[in-house]
Amino acid sequence: MARRTRSRAASSRKGAGKAALLLHEKVVLSDESIIEIVLWRLPRPTPDRPHGFKYRLYYGRRGVCLVRYDNEAGKGDHRHVRGREMPYEFKSVEQLRRDFERDVRATGGKDEENA
């Protein structure tokens, strides 16, 4: 059985210019693999994040990252699948999640809906 933690709220960080936490979900699956999704809305778009979101979607097992989508500063949108880094074209939050879940399934994992 999967253990889930979930929060959907504005960030506890107050003040102008701070990113607002929109979503933080973490699921520990029965095989001890972890799916974690964190999404923030930025106060304004940036050159690296023109869509105005900062995100990290992670799937790993026993300390090994199998799939990760993120857009750290200086790198922009990209994904890691089994150790290989590739550019990622961000279209929407919904598409980001669908693409991540597709890669999780392709690596032999389960997405959250099927956990």
List where the protein language model places each region.
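Short, compact, well-ordered microdomains
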Residues: R84-N114
